[in-house]
C-alpha cells in the first residue's frame, strides 16, 4: 500500500501558542548534532524496522516503538504538548459536542504532527516510520479520550442527555439493534445471496466474519476498530472467492455483510463507525479500507430501514409465521434477562450493566507506562530507590504482552484452520507466521494458495 506523504499542514491554529509564550518557545534554537543520542535512536529504529516493510501488504505499525521514541529526552517538548492538550480537553468541560471534539482533536493532531519534524528521534524518521509515529500519537490520545468521545461510554459516565450528535449515535444504535433482533431469522436467499454453497459452510464463514467484527468493541483507537472491520471484510471476501462471486463486487459483498450483521448482533456498530469516521485521520483511510468502511455504513443504513418489502420473499405466509415465532422468542429472552438483572449485584462502575470496557490490554499496559512521563519528577535518591521496582514492572509488562500476543496468534491460527479445513495445517501456520498473525493478509495469502 503506497503512503500519501503530501499532507496539508494547517498553520492558522496552534493550540499551545499561549503555553509557548508563557514558558518560552521550546521550538526555537533547537540544535541537532551528528552524535545526538536521539538521532541515533531514530536511525537505529529505521534500520531495525526497514526489513519488516519489504513485501508487506500493510504499512509498518508498532505502537510500542512509538512509546519508546516518545520516552527519549529529545521528545520531552512533545510529551509536554500532549499532556497539556489532554489535561485541557478533560478538565475544561465534561461534555464537548461532536463537532467540537472533531475540531479540537484534528487541530491537535495537525499541530503535533508538524512538531514531529522538529524534535528527535522523530525528526530523522523516514516516511514509513513517521507514519507509524503519527499512528501511535492518534492511538495514544484517543485511548485517553475514548470515554469522552465514544457515545455509549460518554452517556454511561454522565448519565444525562448529551448533545444532539452524540444522542443520535445512541438512538441509531438502538434502532439498529431492534431491527437486528426482529430480522435475525431471515435466510440468505431473502437478501438475494445465491445458494452456491452448503448452509453449514456458509454459516461457518458468517460466524467467523461476525466474530471479527464483534472485536470492534474491544478496542479504543480508531485504527484498531478499523482493523476489525477490515478483517471481517476479508473473511467475507474469502467466502465470495470460494463461491466464485467476488467478481460481482458490492452486489455480492454488501448482502453477505448485512447477513453477518444480522447473525452477529454486534452492539454499538453505528457509534463505532461514526467514531472511526470522526477520529481516524483521513490520510489513513484509503483504498480498500475506505471501500469496506463505506460498505459497512451502507449495510447499517439498509438494516435500520429494513422492512418486509426490502426482502425477497417467496412465501409471505411462511415469512409471517417465522417473524411471529422470533417475536415470541424475543419476548421470552427479554423476560429471562430481567430475571437475571434482579439477581445480579450492582456494579458501581457499571450503573446499568452496559458500560463498555475495551479489552485492548496491550495498549492499556503501554499507555500506563506513558502515564509515568506525566508524573512529577522525584529527587535523585527517590529515583534510584525505584529503579529495581521499575525494572520488575517492565519485565512483567513484557511478559504479559507476549502472553496476550501468543493467545491472539493461537486464536488467529484456529480461525484460519476453520476457514480452510482442506488445507495443510502446517502451511496455514507458516503463512500465519509470515504475516505476523494478521488475519487480513493471512486470508489474502491463503486464498491465493487455494486457487
Swiss-Prot record:
InterPro entries: CUE, DUF5601, UBA-like_sf, VPS9, Vps9-like, Vps9_CUE, VPS9_dom_sf. GO terms for biological process: Golgi to endosome transport; late endosome to vacuole transport via multivesicular body sorting pathway; protein localization to endosome; protein targeting to vacuole; vacuole inheritance. Gene3D superfamilies: 1.10.246.120, DNA helicase RuvA subunit, C-terminal domain, VPS9 domain. The modification Phosphoserine is found at residue 375. It is found in: Cytoplasm. The keyword Cytoplasm applies. Residues 26-54 have a biased composition (Basic and acidic residues). GO terms for molecular function: guanyl-nucleotide exchange factor activity; small GTPase binding; ubiquitin binding. Homodimer. This is Vacuolar protein sorting-associated protein 9. It comes from Saccharomyces cerevisiae (strain ATCC 204508 / S288c).
Amino acid at each position: 500500500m503506497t503512503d500519501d506523504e503530501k499532507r496539508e499542514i494547517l498553520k492558522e491554529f496552534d493550540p499551545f501558542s499561549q503555553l509557548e509564550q508563557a514558558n518560552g518557545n521550546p521550538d526555537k534554537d533547537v540544535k541537532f548534532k551528528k552524535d545526538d543520542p536521539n538521532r541515533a535512536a531514530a536511525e537505529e529504529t529505521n534500520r531495525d524496522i526497514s526489513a519488516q516493510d519489504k513485501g508487506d501488504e500493510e504499512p509498518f505499525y508498532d505502537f510500542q516503538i512509538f512509546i519508546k521514541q516518545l520516552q527519549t529526552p529529545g521528545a520531552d517538548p512533545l510529551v509536554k504538548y500532549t499532556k497539556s492538550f489532554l489535561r485541557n480537553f478533560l478538565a475544561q468541560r465534561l461534555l464537548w459536542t461532536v463537532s467540537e471534539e472533531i475540531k479540537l482533536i484534528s487541530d491537535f493532531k495537525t499541530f503535533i504532527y508538524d512538531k514531529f519534524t522538529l524534535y528527535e528521534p522523530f525528526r530523522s524518521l523516514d516516511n514509513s516510520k513517521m507514519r507509524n509515529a503519527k499512528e501511535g500519537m492518534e492511538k495514544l490520545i484517543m485511548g485517553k479520550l475514548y470515554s469522552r468521545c465514544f457515545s455509549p461510554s460518554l452517556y454511561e459516565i454522565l448519565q444525562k442527555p448529551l448533545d444532539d450528535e452524540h444522542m443520535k449515535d445512541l438512538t441509531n444504535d438502538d434502532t439498529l439493534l431492534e431491527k437486528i433482533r426482529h430480522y435475525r431469522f431471515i435466510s440468505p436467499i431473502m437478501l438475494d445471496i445465491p445458494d452456491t454453497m452448503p448452509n453449514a459452510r456458509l454459516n461457518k464463514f458468517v460466524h467467523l466474519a461476525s466474530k471479527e467484527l464483534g472485536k470492534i468493541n474491544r478496542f479504543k483507537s480508531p485504527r484498531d476498530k478499523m482493523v476489525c472491520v477490515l478483517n471481517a471484510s476479508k473473511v467475507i471476501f474469502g467466502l465470495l472467492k470460494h463461491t466464485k462471486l467476488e467478481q460481482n463486487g458490492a452486489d455480492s459483498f454488501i448482502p453477505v455483510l448485512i447477513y453477518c450483521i444480522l447473525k452477529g448482533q454486534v452492539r454499538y456498530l453505528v457509534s463505532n463507525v461514526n467514531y472511526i469516521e470522526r477520529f481516524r485521520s483521513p490520510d489513513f483511510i484509503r483504498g480498500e479500507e475506505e471501500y469496506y468502511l463505506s460498505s459497512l455504513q451502507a449495510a447499517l443504513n439498509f438494516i435500520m430501514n429494513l422492512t418486509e418489502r426490502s426482502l425477497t420473499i417467496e412465501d409471505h405466509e411462511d415469512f409471517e409465521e417465522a417473524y411471529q415465532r422470533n417475536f415470541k422468542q424475543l419476548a421470552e429472552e427479554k423476560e429471562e434477562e430481567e430475571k437475571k438483572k434482579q439477581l445480579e449485584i450492582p456494579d458501581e462502575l457499571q450503573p446499568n450493566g452496559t458500560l463498555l470496557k475495551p479489552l485492548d490490554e496491550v495498549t492499556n499496559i503501554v499507555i500506563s507506562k506513558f502515564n509515568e512521563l506525566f508524573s512529577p519528577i522525584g529527587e535523585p535518591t527517590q529515583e534510584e530507590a525505584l529503579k529495581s521496582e521499575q525494572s520488575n514492572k517492565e519485565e512483567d509488562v513484557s511478559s504479559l504482552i507476549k502472553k496476550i500476543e501468543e493467545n491472539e496468534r493461537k486464536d488467529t491460527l484456529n480461525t484460519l484452520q476453520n476457514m480452510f479445513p482442506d488445507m495443510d495445517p502446517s502451511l496455514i501456520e507458516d503463512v500465519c507466521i509470515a504475516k505476523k498473525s494478521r488475519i487480513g493478509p493471512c486470508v489474502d495469502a491463503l486464498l491465493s494458495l487455494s486457487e
